[in-house]
Amino acid sequence: SSIKNVLFISSTSVYGDSSSFDCAQDDTLSVTEETELNPETESGKQLAQAEQLLQSNSNFKTTILRFGGLIGEDRHPIKFLAGRKNIENPDAPINMINQEDCMGIILGILCHSKPTEVWNQTFNAVAPFHPSRREYYTNKAIEFNLTLPEFNLECLTFGKTILSTKLETVLGYSFIKPIL
């Protein structure tokens, strides 16, 4: 085969949200590339299967790039959440990335000076910014002059903090938009 390397764009949804979240920032909920996959959504399950299928093919080297929630100039989740009521997981940390960083990271992998360091790897790609969903979306609604979202404060919160330390170390990547 003439294909030597495959860069597969995946999602942090492959980790799932099965851990209850303690507001005291319990370190056991920090997710790295070594964390076992536990997808809960259909799309998360399909992405995990695709990752495994590509990684098991010895005809080429596959690098998996798992992006968090995407934010861009015309794309922001507050536009969907503004004015909604009973939103779950208010204390869960956000795990998002700006589209400028997505492009920077992809280019960083494709143009890396030492290809052996970046192929056959898995990288999480999430901005190092993890306020609670309630704090973040409330502030963004105010910033965009939108109706405040209302959160369900009665139920147990589930969530995770996804770390991109490996990406920053191996690629030497510095986030263009570290604060979203």
PLM regions: where:
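NAD(P)-cofactor binding segment of oxidoreductase domains
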Residues: 1-9
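Conserved catalytic-site region of short-chain dehydrogenase/reductase
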Residues: 9-20, 29-30, 39, 70-74
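Catalytic helix-loop patch of NAD(P)-dependent Rossmann-fold dehydrogenases
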Residues: 19-64
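Structural element of the ATP-grasp superfamily
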Residues: 54, 167-168
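Substrate-positioning beta->alpha
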Residues: 64-70, 76-79, 87-110
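A short C-terminal helix-loop "cap" of Rossmann-like NAD(P)-dependent dehydrogenase/epimerase domains
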Residues: 81-89, 144-150
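Mid/C-terminal beta-alpha module of Rossmann-like enzyme folds, strongest
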Residues: 105-108, 112-164
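Amphipathic terminal alpha-helices
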Residues: 179-180
